[in-house]
Amino acid sequence: MVHSNTFAEFIGRKVNKVRWKPEDLMASTMFVTGSWDNDEDNVLELWGLSSQDEDLAKDFPPKLLDSVQQDGDVTQIRFLDNKFVAVSTDRGTVKLYRIIGENESPTVHIKEVTAWEELHSFEKGQKCCCKDIAVCNYSLATIGEDYKINIISLNTKQVHQAIEDVSSSPLTCICFLTETQVLCCNSLSQMKLWDLRVDKSDITADINNFTQNQVPLTCIAQHPSQKHFIFTGSEEGDVGVWDMRTNSLLTTMSSGDTSALTELAFHPLEPDHMFSCSFGGRLLQWSSKKSYMCRNDPGDLEYSNFWVNTDKVKTRLSVNDVIKPIYSPINSLDIQKQQLVCGADNEAIYLQKHLKL
């Protein structure tokens, strides 16, 4: 145990990505992890909690339900729904898996459905890393070290659009802004917006972070309800808030942790709570101080607008550790209902089942 209501389990592999298996009505009892930096022995693993009991101790340690070997380091994991999950690796490959069976069933397992080999490669067929993937309805977007974006139709299982030479510096992360627009970040503190309905050589917007320091953008998150607000994490630990209606940087937030942010995620139902993890081993909860809200002021912004008001961010932002710093990179986190899971380079996964919101 590392903190109140938080449990840790050492699984013997560095965890690069972790994701809850989605559930609509109840708290999920299954999650997947992807490992990295383990030579030729990296895996996608499916884990199950023993129950949905309120007593967290009864859920831990989680049970390993299935394991699938991966060709290289796992770089991203994205669920399409509660059955299908896409996994990318540093060998330029993306695979689609189906989770068959329910938790605690003796037949639960992971089955490969489709594989897209060498989506990203250099000249002469040399494989390169698929840096990130994003999912929107029936489309899958990938970016790689070859400065290329692939758009895959999940209906046909084919690459129906490939955009090359999209950046002059390494791409770091990608997300769908809308069903027909993808947004990618690079190591020069830039974001590029692509409209998939127009000619593939035309860029919709080239958005610069107008600061003197070109700090790499390392991760990206979209506001759950106000999709035009984009949040980016930087190599120096700052969070930028962008309004994609005007392609402008509204404000920058800092927690005092100057290590690179590895992931950002909003609570899906309580968007005034955002979570981050970092290379420095901190898992943080960024929240509006509700007690400071001017309830007598009918013109006061709702909680969902808190992030984009510079004055309110400065006076009402609360940043707290979810777990005690572990001083080893925390690479990934995910939130589902009131429970959070994260994975780190110390070969451990951490679970907190009762988030304080």
Model-derived features: positions:
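Per-blade loop-tip surfaces of WD-repeat and WD-like beta-propellers in eukaryotic adaptors/scaffolds
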Residues: 49-60, 96-117, 144-171, 177-181, ...
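Beta-propeller domains
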Residues: 1-9, 26-66, 99-112
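Structural hallmark of WD40 beta-propellers
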Residues: 26-32, 83-86, 137-141, 179-183, ...
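Blade-loop segments of beta-propeller domains
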Residues: 56-82, 119
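Surface loop/turn motifs at the tips and blade-to-blade linkers of beta-strand repeat domains
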Residues: 8-10, 66-69, 121-125, 163-166, ...
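Blade-level signature of beta-propeller repeat domains, shared across WD40, Kelch, NHL, RCC1
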Residues: 331-357
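Conserved strand-to-loop turn within each blade of WD40 beta-propeller repeats
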Residues: 35-36, 88-91, 143-146, 185-188, ...
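Canonical WD40 repeat/beta-propeller blade segments in eukaryotic WD-repeat proteins
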Residues: 13-22, 72-79, 123-135, 168-176, ...
